[in-house]
């Protein structure tokens, strides 16, 4: 047997044996993301596959006629990825499976797969609206591209052209599980000052639905914040149907949208052909060990202002339902006067300069408009530092863990005599490979940079304690989604087997104080907490996990910091946010810093083991 086919067969066997929960949306599921079909079962789709015996059309029942196109594409994804083995002997033959997967890949890429198709079959048929799926909502919002009398498509309009709000014709409550009242986000955002930190609403935890610090994606697009003109979404995983549905329900289905993404997708590759106002670009990576892992938004408004969102959530439904995510939602940054210089409107934290440095690192002409908008905006009131990572070897202190260390060395106010009494609490959704000894990186360069302080002694001394919050197997079992709650925690058993010493650093996910105890964390955050648990020296909210790929590793030869991934986060320092030396963590404090987990952290008990993704195999 062909070795690659054997590996594929093994993978398919593992996928079909995977513990799957039935999708809550049932026959109304509109999802296209392969991750969703890997994690959830869809009986109505599997029934169709059970009755499918050839590479031709699927035997889709008449009752699904209105969503036939959507179901066909969903079935193609399931077969192509090997997520379901149909209950008939013909399709269980490995050679038949391989042939079918090639057929479905061809069909998804628009190739002709019908051997005896008539000439009529090659004619383009106008898309028909589909009644019951969110994917069909996008058809209602298609841009009608002008055509001149000679049949030539006219050039797309520029960013300066106004695109109207298009009120949705469907009820948002019929499609989204948690819907907050419209028109109230501006007041809610203002009340979140001076931190502007939000945690995503948990669908299964009703207590979170009305929390002042909880947020839904629809609230990010709420019109009380201003009328959107265009937006830039920078992310890793993007489920296009879900994202466009969010814009549709906000009335922004015709507004220009640019997407930078890290995980390849056929839908994203071809979206501009279907929707000329949506521009999507895959960010190439130099190494498979690096990821385009940043989660950021730049929202540009019709009045010339903009807002920046730095988040931990991918742009697909699972990340916005029962997972703990965090985001910083900036205040509005107004447009500078026309005579202003590009460097005007800078903040005390140099946020504008840092954001431009990050955007320019892509070297993408598609970002020119957003770079210019940032240059023309006033960031003078921004009180956080942008902390980003970008692939490459860096000799300055502008990126990764040396950026963190440099800022803390200037501004962290922990007294030197108390240095060992303030542990570093690092909370992540995945752990890296650190080697046989923690001193090689974890309690070496990483801990050294994340625990720097002002007036630090140059004398060598023991580092502060490191407490790593990462869910145990027991934590995941009690999650809202049972074992599937671990779908956002990709730490592997093989990696853990090589560093058993890590167990002594691990602490459980406990978040009863924010009603997120059963919502597994995809958030990543770092802080230093006083011995009595009443104060924090800083708070870093970021996409970066505790890994070398995210924060970098030092090249001992030339001193360069080697980073493999794109990441973005914001660092909150008390001096800039509250004009004090520390953040208060006390319940009734006036400017209380709300962290998503319980303090003090609870250590793993004897016999506990960290969650590993192999449990889903």
Residue ranges and their predicted role:
Residues 1-121:
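Cys/His Zn-binding finger modules involved in RNA regulation
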């Amino acid at each position: 047997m062909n070795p690659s086919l054997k590996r594929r067969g093994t993978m398919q066997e593992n996928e079909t044996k995977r513990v799957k929960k039935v999708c809550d949306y049932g026959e109304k599921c509109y999802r296209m993301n392969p991750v969703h079909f890997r994690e959830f079962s869809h009986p109505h789709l599997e029934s169709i596959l059970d009755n499918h015996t050839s590479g031709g059309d699927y035997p889709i029942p008449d009752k699904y006629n209105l969503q036939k196109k959507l179901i066909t594409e969903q079935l193609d994804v399931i077969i192509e990825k090997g997520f379901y083995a149909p209950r008939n002997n013909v399709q269980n033959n490995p050679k038949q499976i391989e042939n079918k997967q090639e057929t479905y890949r061809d069909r998804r890429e628009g190739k002709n797969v019908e051997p005896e198709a008539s000439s009529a079959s090659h004619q383009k048929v106008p898309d028909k609206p589909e009644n019951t799926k969110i994917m069909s909502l996008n058809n209602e919002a298609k841009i009608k591209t002008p055509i001149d009398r000679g049949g030539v498509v006219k050039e797309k309009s520029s960013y300066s052209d106004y695109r109207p709000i298009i009120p949705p014709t469907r009820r948002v409550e019929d499609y989204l599980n948690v819907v907050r009242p419209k028109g109230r986000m501006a007041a809610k955002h203002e009340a979140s000052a001076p931190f502007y930190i939000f945690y995503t609403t948990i669908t299964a935890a009703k207590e979170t639905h009305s929390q002042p610090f909880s947020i839904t994606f629809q609230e990010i697009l709420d019109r009380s914040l201003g009328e959107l003109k265009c937006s830039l979404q920078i992310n890793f995983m993007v489920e296009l149907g879900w994202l466009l549905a969010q814009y549709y329900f906000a009335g922004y289905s015709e507004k220009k949208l640019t997407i930078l993404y890290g995980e390849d997708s056929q839908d994203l590759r071809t979206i501009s052909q279907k929707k000329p106002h949506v521009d999507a670009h895959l960010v190439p990576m130099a190494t498979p060990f690096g990821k385009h892992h940043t989660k950021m938004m730049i929202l540009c408004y019709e009045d010339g202002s903009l807002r920046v969102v730095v988040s931990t959530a991918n742009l697909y439904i699972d990340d916005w339902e029962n997972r703990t995510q965090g985001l910083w939602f900036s205040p509005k940054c107004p447009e500078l006067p026309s005579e202003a210089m590009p460097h005007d409107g800078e903040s005390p934290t140099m946020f504008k300069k840092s954001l431009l440095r990050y955007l320019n690192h892509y070297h993408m002409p598609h970002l020119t408009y957003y770079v210019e908008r940032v240059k023309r905006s006033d960031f003078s009131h921004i009180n956080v530092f942008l902390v980003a990572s970008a692939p490459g070897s860096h000799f300055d202190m502008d990126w990764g863990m040396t950026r963190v260390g440099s800022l803390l060395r200037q501004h962290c106010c922990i007294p030197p005599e108390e240095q060992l009494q303030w542990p570093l609490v690092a909370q992540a959704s995945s752990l890296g490979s650190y080697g046989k000894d923690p001193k090689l990186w974890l309690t070496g360069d990483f801990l050294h940079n994340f625990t720097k302080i002002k007036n630090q002694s140059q004398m060598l001394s023991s580092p502060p304690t490191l407490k790593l919050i990462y869910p145990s197997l027991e934590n995941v079992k009690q999650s809202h989604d049972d074992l599937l709650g671990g779908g956002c925690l990709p730490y592997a058993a093989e990696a853990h087997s090589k560093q058993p010493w890590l167990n002594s650093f691990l602490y459980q996910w406990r978040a009863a104080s924010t009603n997120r105890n059963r919502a597994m964390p995809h958030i990543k955050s770092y802080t230093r907490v006083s011995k009595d648990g009443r104060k924090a020296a800083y708070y870093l909210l970021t996409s970066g996990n505790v890994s070398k790929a995210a924060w970098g590793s030092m090249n001992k030869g030339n001193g360069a910091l080697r980073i493999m991934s794109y990441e973005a986060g914001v660092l909150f320092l008390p001096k800039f946010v509250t004009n004090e030396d520390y953040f208060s963590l006390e319940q009734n404090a006036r400017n209380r810093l709300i962290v998503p987990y319980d303090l003090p952290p609870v250590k793993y008990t004897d016999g506990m083991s960290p969650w590993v993704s192999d449990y889903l195999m």
